């Protein structure tokens, strides 16, 4: 999915706010995904799935850090996420259907925490960005 100049502007405007609270927002999004879609837990057999557990907040921070890295390379998301794509496709073998689930939950969390900043244009841009990242992360699956 091609990101327009306007999309990139909105992503660059909101990502620093999300990244500043990566453990909190990423943890909330992960917790929501695990709660609403229990099958996603299978890839994390040793996790404590309680709200604000150390494993969930740590995983959430990794997710947001990776998204922030991608946001810093909007003209080369595939290149900036290549190693992470390899990890998910070849080592972790995560179900590619899980990426859109986490993306949806991250949109919910961002909308809750930034209601004024999360206007329709930002919503559209962030949704396109997360879809692009999901596509990149699943590009090496067969």
Curated annotation (Swiss-Prot):
Binding site for O2: 59
The protein, known as: Hemoglobin subunit alpha-2
Keyword check for Transport: yes
Positions with a binding annotation for heme b: 88
Gene: hba2
Keyword presence, Disulfide bond: no
Naturally occurring in which organism (per UniProt): Xenopus laevis (African clawed frog)
Domain of life according to the entry: Eukaryota
Family statement drawn from the similarity comment of this UniProt entry: Belongs to the globin family.
PROSITE patterns noted in UniProt: GLOBIN
Taxonomic lineage from the root: Eukaryota, Metazoa, Chordata, Craniata, Vertebrata
